[in-house]
């Protein structure tokens, strides 16, 4: 299947690689189908809408930048995503890419959770947490 993308141009994808977000993503509720596309030679992954070429979120696996990051998924999320164990889960966070890049932040309060076996995804909004929507990727660099 051919799709147009924000960062990769026109590409072929396999329909079995599509991740379905049954409830959409907050702010994009009508967007239900996405594909994960690695950005070559970077730790970044694009969560690309299959239907809207201009909609691509830059993601990272949070543990490289935030080694103590941990979340607990509620029973409702486990059921929605049909998660039976940790081996089912891939966890990402959305970046807000800034200029200069040192000012880039990660949304740790609303991670993207994907059941890699069932190809189901959800952006989970964490409550009762110290995580915020803007955590600097490079905290040792102080914003000017």
UniProtKB/Swiss-Prot annotation:
GO BP annotation list: bacterial-type flagellum assembly; regulation of translation
Keyword Chloroplast: no
Key words, A-Z: Bacterial flagellum biogenesis, Chaperone, Cytoplasm, Translation regulation
Keyword Chaperone in annotation: yes
Compartment(s) where it occurs, according to its Swiss-Prot or TrEMBL record: Cytoplasm
Broad class of the protein's primary localization: cytoplasm
One Gene Ontology cellular component: cytoplasm
Highest taxon above the source species: Bacteria
Transmembrane segments: none
Protein family membership: Belongs to the FliW family.
UniProt subunit comment: Interacts with translational regulator CsrA and flagellin(s).
PANTHER family: FLAGELLAR ASSEMBLY FACTOR FLIW
Job of this protein: Acts as an anti-CsrA protein, binds CsrA and prevents it from repressing translation of its target genes, one of which is flagellin. Binds to flagellin and participates in the assembly of the flagellum.
Protein name: Flagellar assembly factor FliW
Source organism (scientific name): Geobacillus sp. (strain WCH70)
